[in-house]
Amino acid sequence: MKVAIVIPSDINSAPYLQYYADVLKRKEIPYYFISWNRKGSNDSLLCENNIVYTLESAETIPLYRKYIDYMCFSAFVRKELENGNYDFVIVHTIQASLFLGKYLKKYFNNKYIIDIRDYSKLLIIYKSRFHKYLKCSALNCVSSPGFLSWLPGDTEFTVSHNLRSDSVYRDYKYVLFDKKIIRILTIGQLRDYSTNSRIIDAFGDKNSVLLHFAGNGNAKESLEELVLQRKYKNVVFTGRYRKEEENDIVERADFINILLPTGIHDVNIMSNRFYLAVIHRKPMIVNEESIQARYVEKYRLGVVVNEQDNICEKLMQYIDLFDADLFNEGCDLIKKEISSEILLFEKKVESCFS
């Protein structure tokens, strides 16, 4: 057997590909990535087992150009599948599934997996077509149960967390807050100005709080300008970081900020920050509209705020009433739940190759 793992982006930007690779390695099944080098980088060309389609395609290009670029990538994938004698396909994203769906349905019926980790506006037009492709797959996976709110209700989906199984079992110890300085970390892409500026204005004039923003993004420059305008002295931007630095950055924090926009995608995702907070046992700040708030409330993992709340007051109340035993118990319980769902995902993927 030979498996193709299709991703319409650079494989270095998609760590979740390894969840499938882990299973295939255990079963000693040969596999190849078929990826799209959209930024013209040479990094992906050096990766093992990676068949690369190179065409620069920025996120900001017009919609018709995106359509043409996806058509070209899909043609490249079809040609590789035909010439490479593949037996099974794992295709990531709704967009790639739609462009390849007709071909997969005809030549790989019940021999492909659709993996969904993002919402796509293409579903507004092509929802019924996508439904057909889901019905003809061997397995359908989602990175968040929140996606079920906009996916077909008569189709079975398996949760594939944005986490490898070995990461869940890392045992970090909870460290009590340093009451002199509370360190609130926002880590990862800084895409949204509104939610991040809300955090900055909530704590920007509080000497007892240090706000740390680690990562780049479209909103970073505007947020830095806001801090300068407000003359806040307790906000730090450290920019891009290496993956190997991530654990040390998180360990120095007391809270993880996960306030997100309230669009259909953002309220339904399980963010990487959420998993970092759980693994490192760091209380988190989430907005009540998000699916992450359900877990935070159920397992007592932090502070849930709405649009009217005074975030600073809620955080200080949480600290005053904080029970370390209850918090650690909640971390243990959610890690157990995540572990069981990862095990179920791996078993279902393995069953596709039995």
What would you call each of these model-derived segments?
Residues 1-40, 84, 139, 201-205:
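N-terminal subdomain of nucleotide-sugar transferases
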Residues 6, 141, 175-195, 199-206, ...:
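Conserved donor-binding/catalytic core segment of Leloir-type glycosyltransferases
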Residues 10-12, 23-71:
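N-terminal strand-loop element at the rim of the active site
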Residues 22, 74-79, 98-102, 106-107, ...:
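Membrane-proximal helix-turn-helix segments that form the acceptor-binding/catalytic region
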Residues 121, 135-179:
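Donor nucleotide-sugar binding/catalytic pocket of nucleotide-sugar-dependent glycosyltransferases
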Residues 194, 244-249, 256-276, 285-294:
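Nucleotide-sugar-dependent
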Residues 221-248:
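Nucleotide-activated donor-binding/catalytic signature segment of Leloir-type glycosyltransferases, i.e.
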Residues 306-313, 319-354:
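A charged, aromatic-enriched C-terminal amphipathic alpha-helix characteristic of glycosyltransferases
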